[in-house]
């Protein structure tokens, strides 16, 4: 189009020059006129070429501008694709907490949990509708009555870690089985049968978070897991801040009992030991090796001479272990132990969960222990409010804090 304009214009100029030279008669004058008009014509052609080039560049820029203007509008459209890329893609192969490789073809829809801790985790992750079988005696555990009453009497029973019911597990037709370390041999058996099974062993805060994320990844509950682990981090930072300025000399030695006997305690690598140290205490059993409840003698307990003795709940309906605080206080062999002499033998609250165990609510154990050991930095009233908010957020029920606050009122009286 532009080239045609050039030729038409040039033809017009030459024709114009010819006519003018003819009118001028004299050959000399015609040559002079011809030179002037040719110079003028060339100047005009160059000007027109420059104008056309600018016009063409402007048109190209104008054509590009809408695309540039539209680019920001494409960003939101790309975001879902990025989010989808970040989500778990199946088939998925993971390693469980014992290092076993497990592959799932799709997100689990039918879950068998043979471990109370993983069952509670599934409830906290919003997966209770996917539980088709659980550990035994769920009707005796308060958390089921409070947060998942619809499971009681409606789902299968696969026994305990010590007596796992393989047949009941298979009958539930699961596409994911979650087992504790004590039942690890059954995981291998299930794998041979083509049933994906993972083994979990959350014996530290880090391992607890790892377990939560592992279960979430296999079930499509990543968003819930993100919120839950964020709360863990929040509580950990809170406790760390509360106890940061407590001098080592002001940190009491704390003896954590087992639920079967007060001559059973938590060694240094057990989850319960981390609760004590996080809350500004010293674990009396830190000289003991291992990550499970360890039996000791009277002589060992007397030598530990703890300032505080804590008796955890047993996770069942009455929440009481196989002995009472009064039994500990009245044991003649312990009368010289500091905790007994000073009446510092305490039961953890009952009616909810064992906050000394690595369940999702285990972080509440750190807060409770902080309030018990250092009420000057964190009160039991503050703990009750934090605990109620946790259960409402992740388990969906309103917590009755009267048993916690009742203890405080009774002590004050």
Language model: regions and residue ranges:
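Short helix-initiation/N-cap motifs at beta->coil->alpha
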Residues: 97-99, 155-167, 289-298
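A short, structured surface patch at a secondary-structure boundary
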Residues: 113-172, 176-178, 182
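Extracytoplasmic substrate-binding proteins
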Residues: 86-87, 91-94, 101-103, 186-264, ...
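Short, Lys/Arg-enriched N-terminal segments with co-localized hydrophobic residues
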Residues: 3-33
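Bacterial lipoprotein signal-peptidase II cleavage site
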Residues: 50-64, 69
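Bacterial N-terminal signal peptides
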Residues: 43-49
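Alpha-helical, coiled-coil/dimerization segments enriched in small aliphatic residues
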Residues: 265-292
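Proline-aspartate-enriched helix->loop->beta-strand connector
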Residues: 158, 166-179, 195, 297-314
